C-alpha cells in the first residue's frame, strides 16, 4: 500500500459516519468512542471541510444531534446528511404517499407527509416493528400497486450495538424485493446520490474527499464508487476479515477516528 502522504494528498473534505465511528449505541443510550470527541474538534479547527453522513433511521435528526451534543460532540443538524429528511424531500417532489414501516423514534420526521391512500412503501430500521404482520402489510400494499415503489432508508446488513450485532434494514428490504419482484430505491449509503448530496453541502469534489466509516461495503465501497477515498476504522461493526474483503479494499485501515484525524492533519497539507 502506498505511503500515507501519497494516499491523503489533495484531501479537502471529510465525510464522517456516526454510529461505530463517533459513538456506539445500546438500548440504554450511546457512548462516545475513545478519542472521537477530541478528534472531531481537531478536524473542525483545521482547514478541512467536515460533513457527517449517517444511515441512522431509528432517531429523528434532532434527537440524534441532541444525543451527540450531550456526549460532547461539536455538531449541528445543518451539518448532517441523513436519510429520513432526504426521503421526505423525495416523497414531496414525486407526490408519493407512503405506507411506513419504520421505527417510532423517526416517525416525527414524516409529520408533514400525506399518508392517505398510500402509493409507495418506505422501510427503515424498524427494530422490533419488523414483525410478520407488519412485513406482510407492507408486502400487500406493494402488491396492490400497479407500479410498486419501495424506498429503503439505507440497505445495511447489520450494525453493532454494545450488546452485539443487530440485523439492519437490508435483509428486510431484500425480502420485500424478492416477494414483490421489484427493486428498492435506496436513500442513504451506499447510494451515489446520497454521497453526492453530502459533498455538495460542503462544496468539495469527490476526488478531494475522504470517507471515514466502519462499514467496508456501505461506507468504504460506496464512497470509492463515487470517486472518493475511504478509510475504515477498527471500531463499530469492523471485523478482522474486512481487511481481506474480496471486493472492497479501503485506502487505509486505522484503529479509530483519532488515528485517522492524526494522519489527515499530518499529511493533507503536504
From Swiss-Prot:
Reaction equation(s) it catalyzes: diphosphate + H2O = 2 phosphate + H(+)
PANTHER family from the UniProt entry: 4-NITROPHENYLPHOSPHATASE-RELATED (PTHR19288), PHOSPHOLYSINE PHOSPHOHISTIDINE INORGANIC PYROPHOSPHATE PHOSPHATASE (PTHR19288:SF44)
Enzyme nomenclature, EC number: 3.1.3.-, 3.6.1.1
Protein name: Phospholysine phosphohistidine inorganic pyrophosphate phosphatase
Disulfide bonds: none
Location within or outside the cell: Cytoplasm; Nucleus
Organism this protein belongs to: Mus musculus (Mouse)
GO MF term list: inorganic diphosphate phosphatase activity; metal ion binding; phosphatase activity; protein homodimerization activity
Binding site for Mg(2+): 17, 19, 214
